[in-house]
Amino acid sequence: MNTHNDWKNLLSIFNEDLEKTGYSLFIVEPEEGFYDCEILKNGELVETYAENYYEDELSDLITDAAHHVLTYLAR
Protein backbone atom coordinates (compact mmCIF):
# COMPACT_ATOMS: atom_id res chain seq x y z
CA MET A 1 0.00 0.00 0.00
CA ASN A 2 1.31 3.43 -0.92
CA THR A 3 0.45 5.67 2.02
CA HIS A 4 1.65 8.80 0.22
CA ASN A 5 -0.81 8.35 -2.64
CA ASP A 6 -3.64 7.37 -0.27
CA TRP A 7 -3.58 10.60 1.72
CA LYS A 8 -2.85 12.72 -1.37
CA ASN A 9 -5.94 11.27 -3.08
CA LEU A 10 -8.08 11.78 0.02
CA LEU A 11 -6.86 15.37 0.35
CA SER A 12 -7.75 16.02 -3.28
CA ILE A 13 -11.26 14.61 -2.83
CA PHE A 14 -11.99 16.68 0.28
CA ASN A 15 -10.57 19.84 -1.30
CA GLU A 16 -12.80 19.36 -4.34
CA ASP A 17 -15.80 19.11 -1.99
CA LEU A 18 -14.71 22.14 0.05
CA GLU A 19 -13.82 24.28 -2.98
CA LYS A 20 -17.25 25.93 -3.23
CA THR A 21 -16.99 27.08 0.41
CA GLY A 22 -13.64 28.80 -0.09
CA TYR A 23 -12.01 26.46 2.42
CA SER A 24 -9.23 24.00 1.72
CA LEU A 25 -6.91 21.71 3.63
CA PHE A 26 -3.17 21.92 3.21
CA ILE A 27 -0.55 19.47 4.45
CA VAL A 28 2.90 20.83 5.24
CA GLU A 29 6.05 19.05 6.35
CA PRO A 30 7.87 21.60 8.54
CA GLU A 31 10.21 18.94 9.87
CA GLU A 32 11.24 15.82 7.97
CA GLY A 33 8.87 12.97 8.76
CA PHE A 34 6.33 15.14 10.60
CA TYR A 35 3.30 16.77 9.03
CA ASP A 36 0.90 19.56 9.94
CA CYS A 37 -2.60 20.12 8.61
CA GLU A 38 -3.61 23.70 7.93
CA ILE A 39 -7.08 25.01 7.15
CA LEU A 40 -7.16 27.80 4.59
CA LYS A 41 -9.95 30.09 3.45
CA ASN A 42 -9.46 31.67 0.05
CA GLY A 43 -5.77 30.78 0.30
CA GLU A 44 -5.23 32.44 3.69
CA LEU A 45 -4.38 30.48 6.83
CA VAL A 46 -7.36 30.21 9.18
CA GLU A 47 -5.84 27.77 11.64
CA THR A 48 -3.27 25.07 12.03
CA TYR A 49 -5.58 22.16 12.77
CA ALA A 50 -2.95 19.68 13.91
CA GLU A 51 0.82 19.43 14.18
CA ASN A 52 3.49 16.73 14.24
CA TYR A 53 1.66 13.80 12.66
CA TYR A 54 3.35 10.88 10.94
CA GLU A 55 2.58 10.15 7.29
CA ASP A 56 0.69 6.95 8.13
CA GLU A 57 -1.71 9.03 10.29
CA LEU A 58 -2.54 11.59 7.60
CA SER A 59 -5.63 9.91 6.12
CA ASP A 60 -7.36 9.99 9.52
CA LEU A 61 -6.11 13.52 10.18
CA ILE A 62 -7.42 14.79 6.82
CA THR A 63 -10.81 13.19 7.47
CA ASP A 64 -10.98 14.77 10.94
CA ALA A 65 -9.96 18.20 9.61
CA ALA A 66 -12.57 18.07 6.83
CA HIS A 67 -15.22 17.10 9.39
CA HIS A 68 -14.08 20.02 11.57
CA VAL A 69 -14.57 22.48 8.68
CA LEU A 70 -17.92 21.03 7.65
CA THR A 71 -19.19 21.13 11.25
CA TYR A 72 -18.15 24.78 11.49
CA LEU A 73 -19.95 25.59 8.22
CA ALA A 74 -23.12 23.81 9.38
CA ARG A 75 -23.55 26.16 12.35
Describe each region flagged by the PLM.
Residues 43, 72-73:
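A general structural signal for short secondary-structure boundary/capping elements
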Residues 1-24, 56-63, 67, 74-75:
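Negatively charged, low-complexity tracts enriched in Asp/Glu with abundant Ser/Thr
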